[in-house]
Amino acid sequence: MDQSLVPADSIWTWKQADGCSLEVAWQCHADTPEQGQNSSVPAVVLVHGFGASGNHWRHNLPVLGKRTRTYALDLIGFGGSSQPQALLAGEQPALGQADRSQSLVYSFDLWGQQVADFCKAVVQGPVVLVGNSIGGVVALRAAQLLEDHCKGVVLIDCAQRLMDDKQLATQPAWMAWIRPLLKALVSQRWLSTALFRNAARPRVIRSVLKQAYPSGNNIDDQLVELLYKPTQRPGAAEAFRGFINLFNDHLAPDLLDNLQQPVDLIWGQKDPWEPVSEAQEWEQRFSCVRSLKILTNAGHCPHDESPEVVNNELITILKKY
């Protein structure tokens, strides 16, 4: 396949070990023939954050694609990929939905395996994984699964996942009291759906973006639409339900502690949700972390808020391979 001509809505059928299949939407930019699958330059695979899609890399794909094959895929439950019904611990599939293509447990193992299998089946060569927010946790898990096929990871404002049970010691004491009630409530589909429908409105999306993008750069109608449109698909609320019920899953520090590949960090100093102090601690704590670039005027999604700066930093990192 000439991947320089791959349309934005390409679909890869992800065949599971149990025989079930899920559809994964993906796109690729590769401007020159020498960037084919036999190139010695690692390809780049971009992994989006919660509620986003591969389109969130709109300002990065074309630029990075001039250097090497660059891919962006939609995680299961998001964008144009399959959106199976979310199963929580102890739940059974509804009648007629035993097939994993219709109902499954959303998890970082699921998404990490998706990215790893995509790299092996579609990219077919060495890769560097770049992840934003929860996409960073996914990238770390995928790097573990890929082993030598993954040459390195770049984390952009990686998610801390403070609501995980393992983070309880870092939370206020009152959180331990209300936590059982909170977990019981958000497990209810009627409530998670109501919360999702409230959040999945253009006005609310724009309001959240103003927090995530403190400079206001690139908050435009295109951005709001690319985030809003996938929320109108029939199964969109299910990924939301699955994610907000992830109370015992992988944390980035645990993955970093067991990672063999080099990791570079890019962080917005004004991120309202993932403090830069955590990135600074990671730089000192984990031997796999080789660099930290702090962007003074950026927030949670600097790759879209300050794409020129992030693209230059990514190109500098890629030159190390």
Language-model regions, residue ranges each:
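Conserved loop-alpha-helix segment in the C-terminal half of the alpha/beta-hydrolase fold
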Residues: 258-298
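Serine-hydrolase catalytic-loop signature spanning alpha/beta hydrolases and amidase-signature enzymes
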Residues: 49-59, 70
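Active-site loop/oxyanion-hole signature of alpha/beta-hydrolase fold enzymes
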Residues: 10-20, 27-35, 71-130, 312
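Conserved alpha/beta-hydrolase catalytic His-Asp/Glu region
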Residues: 190-261
